[in-house]
C-alpha cells in the first residue's frame, strides 16, 4: 500500500505477473481492454481507479458526438426591402450580436425598421426656414410702405384743404354757391370755414351750424336776412337794425322797412315778412353787399341778393320766380323786395299764410316737391 498508483501502473513485473496469471483472459480477448475491465482491475486499488477513468476518457474522446451547431441567422437588414432608403435600428447592447458577411455589419435580434428617408429630413427643414425668413422680411417692409402712403395722403389732404379755402369749388350745377366770395368788407372767405357767419356778419368767424342752429342767421349789426327783427322805431332814426329770425317768430312791430316785403304776420309793419322755407332750401346767398342808410337821399336800405337755381336734373325742384303773395297787415304789404333783390326785378315767393304752413315750409302752394 506504500506504492503510489503511478508506480503500480509503470511496474513491468506487475504487468508480467498479471499476464502469466491471467493468460487465459488475454487469450480470450484479443481486443484492447475495455473500460469495464480496467475498472474491474483497478477496483482493488482505489488510487489506480482514477487514473484508469482518465485514460478511458482520452481513448473514447474521438467517438463522442459534438453538440449540434446553431442554425444560421438571417440578417434582418439584408432580408428587408427598405434598407436602401431607411435606417435599421438593429443593434442592441443587451442582445448577442451577429456579423453579416453580406452587408458587413453587426446586428442583434429585436431590431426594428425606421421609416425615415436617408437625408430627407434635413432637406425638408431647410425649405420652410427660407420661406419663413422671406415672409418675415416682406412683412417687415409692408408697414413702412403703409406709413409712407398715409403720410403722403395726409399731406395731399392738407394741401387740398389750403387750396379749398381760397378757391371756389368746381361744381357746375351750383355755380358759385359753395365757392368763396369776395367783398370789400369780408375779403376772400371760404364757404366751409365761415359757413353762414361770413355771409351775414362784418367780421366772419367759424361757426358750427349744428351748435348755433337758427341764432347764427342775423345776430350781428347790419345783417340783412329774410325776417325783420321787431324793433320799435323806423329806419329814419335807427342806423343799425338787427335782422334775422327772432327765435323762430317773424313779428314786425312798428318797423317801416323790412328785408323782404313778403308775408307780414301782424302789427303796423309796412313789409318785413318771412320767406318760404321751401324757397330757402332752393336759395343760397352767394354775394351779399351791405348798404348803410343814407340820411340825405332816400333813407332806404338796399340789399343785393343773388338767386341761384340748382340744376333741375340734380334736384328736380320746381322754381317759382315771378309769383308773390302778401298777407301783411298794414299799408305797405307789397311782395316786391326793396331795392330789386333780383337783377331782373323778380319777386320772392313768400308762401304760407299760417304758422303751420310757415313751419312746414310748403304752405298752400299748388306745386309739390317731387323729392318728398
Curated annotation (Swiss-Prot):
Zn(2+) binds at residues 75, 78, 100, 103. Keywords: Activator, DNA-binding, Metal-binding, Nucleus, Transcription, Transcription regulation, Zinc, Zinc-finger. One of its GO terms (biological process) is root radial pattern formation. The keyword Zinc applies. A zinc finger (Dof-type) spans 73-127. Residues 128-145 have a biased composition (Low complexity). GO terms for molecular function: DNA-binding transcription factor activity; transcription cis-regulatory region binding; zinc ion binding. Disruption phenotype: Disruption of interfascicular cambium formation and development in inflorescence stems. Transcription factor that binds specifically to a 5'-AA[AG]G-3' consensus core sequence. Promotes expression. The PEAR proteins (e.g. DOF2.4, DOF5.1, DOF3.2, DOF1.1, DOF5.6 and DOF5.3) activate gene expression that promotes radial growth of protophloem sieve elements. Involved in the regulation of interfascicular cambium formation and vascular tissue development, particularly at a very early stage during inflorescence stem development; promotes both cambium activity and phloem specification, but prevents xylem specification. This is Dof zinc finger protein DOF5.6. It comes from Arabidopsis thaliana.
Amino acid at each position: 500500500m506504500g506504492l503510489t498508483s503511478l508506480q503500480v501502473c509503470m511496474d513491468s513485473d506487475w504487468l508480467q505477473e498479471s499476464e502469466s496469471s491471467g493468460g487465459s483472459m488475454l487469450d480470450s480477448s484479443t481486443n484492447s481492454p475495455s473500460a469495464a475491465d480496467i475498472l474491474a482491475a483497478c477496483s482493488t486499488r482505489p488510487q489506480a481507479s482514477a487514473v484508469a477513468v482518465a485514460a478511458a476518457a482520452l481513448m473514447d474522446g474521438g467517438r463522442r458526438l459534438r453538440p449540434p451547431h446553431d442554425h444560421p441567422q438571417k440578417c434582418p437588414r439584408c432580408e428587408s426591402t427598405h434598407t436602401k432608403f431607411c435606417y435599421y435600428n438593429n443593434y442592441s447592447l443587451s442582445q448577442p450580436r451577429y456579423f453579416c458577411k453580406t452587408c458587413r455589419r453587426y446586428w442583434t435580434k429585436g431590431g426594428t425598421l425606421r421609416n425615415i428617408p436617408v437625408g430627407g429630413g434635413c432637406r425638408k427643414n431647410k425649405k420652410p426656414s427660407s420661406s419663413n425668413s422671406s415672409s418675415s422680411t416682406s412683412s417687415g417692409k409692408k408697414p413702412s410702405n403703409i406709413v409712407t402712403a398715409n403720410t403722403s395722403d395726409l399731406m395731399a389732404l392738407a394741401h387740398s384743404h389750403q387750396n379749398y379755402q381760397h378757391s371756389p369749388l368746381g361744381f357746375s350745377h351750383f355755380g358759385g354757391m359753395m365757392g368763396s366770395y369776395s367783398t370789400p368788407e369780408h375779403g376772400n372767405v371760404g364757404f366751409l370755414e365761415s359757413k353762414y357767419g361770413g355771409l351775414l356778419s362784418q367780421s366772419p368767424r367759424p361757426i358750427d351750424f349744428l351748435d348755433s342752429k337758427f341764432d347764427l342767421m342775423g345776430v350781428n349789426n347790419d345783417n340783412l336776412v329774410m325776417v325783420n327783427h321787431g324793433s320799435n322805431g323806423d329806419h329814419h332814426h335807427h342806423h343799425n337794425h338787427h335782422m334775422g329770425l327772432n327765435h323762430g317768430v317773424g313779428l314786425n312791430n312798428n318797423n317801416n322797412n323790412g328785408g323782404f316785403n313778403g308775408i307780414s304776420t301782424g302789427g303796423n309793419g309796412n313789409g318785413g315778412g318771412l320767406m318760404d322755407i321751401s324757397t330757402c332750401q332752393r336759395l343760397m346767398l352767394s354775394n351779399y353787399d351791405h348798404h348803410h342808410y343814407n340820411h340825405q337821399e332816400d333813407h332806404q336800405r338796399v340789399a343785393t341778393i343773388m338767386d341761384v337755381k340748382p340744376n333741375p336734373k340734380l334736384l328736380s325742384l320746381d322754381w317759382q320766380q315771378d309769383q308773390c303773395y302778401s298777407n301783411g297787415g298794414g299799408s305797405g304789404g307789397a311782395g316786391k323786395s326793396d331795392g330789386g333783390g333780383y337783377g331782373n326785378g323778380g319777386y320772392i315767393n313768400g308762401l304760407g299764410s299760417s304758422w303751420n304752413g310757415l313751419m312746414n315750409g310748403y304752405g298752400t302752394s299748388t306745386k309739390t316737391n317731387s323729392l318728398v
